[in-house]
Amino acid sequence: MLFSWREDPGAQCLLLSLLLLAASEVGSGQLHYSVSEEAKHGTFVGRIAQDLGLELAELVPRLFRVASKRHGDLLEVNLQNGILFVNSRIDREELCGRSAECSIHLEVIVDRPLQVFHVEVEVKDINDNAPVFPMSVKNLFISESRQPGSRFSLEGASDADIGTNSLLTYSLDSTEYFTLDVKRNDEEIKSLGLVLKKYLNREDTPKHYLLITAIDGGKPELTGTTQLKITVLDVNDNAPAFERTIYKVRLLENAPNGTLVVTVNATDLDEGVNKDIAYSFNTDMSADILSKFHLDPVNGQISVKGNIDFEESKSYEIQVEATDKGNPPMSDHCTVLLEIVDINDNVPELVIHSLSLPVLEDSPLSTVIALISVSDRDSGVNGQVTCSLTPHVPFKLVSTFKNYYSLVLDSPLDRESVSAYELVVTARDGGSPSLWATASVSVEVADVNDNAPAFSQSEYTVFVKENNPPGCHIFTVSARDADAQENALVSYSLVERRVGDRALSSYVSVHAESGKVYALQPLDHEELELLQFQVSARDAGVPPLGSNVTLQVFVLDENDNAPALLMPRVGGIGGAVSELVPRSVGAGHVVAKVRAVDADSGYNAWLXYELQPGTGGARIPFRVGLYTGEISTTRALDEVDVPRHRLLVLVKDHGEPSLTATATVLVSLVESGQAPKASSQASAGATGPEAALVDVNVYLIVAICAVSSLLVLTLLLYTALRCSAPPTEGACGPGKPTLVCSSAVGSWSYSQQRQQRVCSGEGLPKTDLMAFSPSLPPCPISRDREEKQDVDVDLSAKPRQPNPDWRYSASLRAGMHSSVHLEEAGILRAGPGGPDQQWPTVSSATPEPEAGEVSPPVGAGVNSNSWTFKYGPGNPKQSGPGELPDKFIIPGSPAIISIRQEPANSQIDKSDFITFGKKEETKKKKKKKKGNKTQEKKEKGNSTTDNSDQ
């Protein structure tokens, strides 16, 4: 049950208010319960959780626990219902002896937040101890000469209980000679005596056997008995008598051995031997008293012979007996009450409870680190203890309850600055001189993941040569994390992205632990000049922190691509090219042009052309442009020149070491108005003078007529099919409008999707032809023309297999990817931000594009019916707005068509197609036939260009 105050109601309310206020501030309180000793296991003591204001559900999460310095196992708390119950046998006499007050002091501790409550459980005495006499049989010698009324002192019984349970009454078996006499003095100490009622007659009854019963005041009553064996003597009829029955003495603790405590004195009225007195301790004295005090049997002096400790026992009760030497001997008893005076001889004690280590560095202020209890076995001022802490530390001591301190966080922690603290707690008492004790507390600061991995640089630049071996180590990234343990374990990974059509992880990888970056495949400068990506460093903390670093990997070019020849009508790899030259041409006439490309870049792709000297050292009337590859005459031809010349042109780049290729050109000199008579095979490969000539003009006229007729028939057939075919969605049906822009250099069709399906008469439209935006401003399109578009944009069309007629062979792809060919072919590049028009650098250093440029001839390991688009190598030249490529490839045609118009007064032949002899005459005839028609077309084209530029 709860402790209740029995004082004035007003004072009681005031005191309770103060206690509640103090408990709310320090997080602790005090409860009082009572329980009877010898209670059974499980006996209810009190609803401690309810009385402390704690919910049952929070007892376990808050680590509800009960602590006691000496008797922690006597009481226990049921965490399910919050009831304090008896856990083991409670013996009040064992706990407190004969002390009037007996209590068990408990400390109840709960965490989150840390709170301490003081609980005092009063142990109530029950009548569980029966009175006990010092001896079960007492021998008493009484002289027959004793007068009736004589009193014989007896040792009374003792009861370990207190209060009414220890109040004893005595009874004696009925006898005619004796009666019991019980006297009570001021100290509530009973003196038991046997009183003689009438004279004894030793001759009648030499011995008397009496039974004395002691009855306590408990309910139910308990009794104890002793037997008196009385021997009747005929001598010594006076017993010794003490001056005082009770002696009160004070003694300082730690008194040295031999210190006199008190001298007791007794006298005997007898004479002779019957008056000689011997002093002794009562036979029921405890072993503790016998070990600490000495009684002189002659003079009755009590002195110290052991260690006297106030903290062990605050007082002693010593029973002294005086016995004479008569026959029979007679005795008397007295009591010495010894009070021990305390001195400051005990050092304070510190005990650290509930040490919460390690402490997180982000712990909030006022976080409780530990609970410290102090105690001093001394009393009064000597037992008053104060605590202090090492200065200049981010902690402080807060007094939460009497003799209890909390070690709390006073300022923020930073493990990266200080990872541990060695604290010294000093406890000092109030004695004079004061005593103190210290305790060390090692506080380790636990790491919190508050630092992200950091790179020494935000960006790294790496240079790697192309054609590196797979798995080559190209760089190592390293990040440092200021945290500790797993919070500082850094792992590396790629920040995945797309590089063109491929994932970044197909190019490079990074080792998760070491940060080493590896190239997973050989890098090709011609394909990829700069690889820019990010590496992420992430620690293993919770939550993880990370940072990124940018790596710019520049792929350095190596001279790993030899020049590739692009020549018309090649019979095979290394085959010769035949050209017919009229003898009437003058100096500087361009006979042919050797075209070569190099897939490398820079100096490795800078090509130079050299004409090998003729056989026998003969001088030939031809030369080759060092950087243009144009074969031209050095002088006017005459009749003495041999009709056939075999020219060897060496093409080499400027790499280290340089790579070369050789082209063979067969030049045949013909008379004006004549044509070869031999077959095309003989004219291409034969070198003898027996080859015949045919009239070029006749063949040209026939070819023009045939082509014109075929074109007219095709247009008629196409118109008929368009008119008769039902409008369907797909082949030639209406689709998204396609923008057609015209300029002086030609027309380009494109849509925003940049993939078009071209209708070409019968059959489904082909999606193999890809046209890219030349970055021209859009031209206005009328509704009529929009409806007549032949190009249908189909965004939902499924990808189709490319036409095998439109593929290059493996040997030509490298050439088609080179910077020269890409510029001359007008290849459109697509950048990372979207398709745009970019013109590669002219590696061959040609000042201006040339006319009459042809594609590789069939039979030289190249399929002329091919089509390709590819990124060009490094250092691309950005085209300006409105620019168009000067040439592009028409699939299925052996020539590269030029769409750039040159000035009319150009000195170099800019014909779109290669002529087979008499180029000048043929051009003059064409100009005469077309007349003003050609001039009108040019004016129309210029007008269109002006509109497009606007």
Curated annotation (Swiss-Prot):
GO biological process: cell adhesion; homophilic cell adhesion via plasma membrane adhesion molecules; nervous system development
Limits of the Cadherin domain: 30-133, 134-242, 243-350, 351-455, 456-565, 581-678
Database matches in SMART domains: CA
Keywords, comma-separated and alphabetical: Calcium, Cell adhesion, Cell membrane, Glycoprotein, Membrane, Repeat, Signal, Transmembrane, Transmembrane helix
Domain of life, per lineage: Eukaryota
Cytoplasmic side: 719-950
Sugar-bearing residue positions: N257, N265, N548
Extracellular side: 30-697
Keyword Cytoplasm: no
Name the record gives this protein: Protocadherin alpha-3
Native source species: Pan troglodytes
Gene (name only): PCDHA3
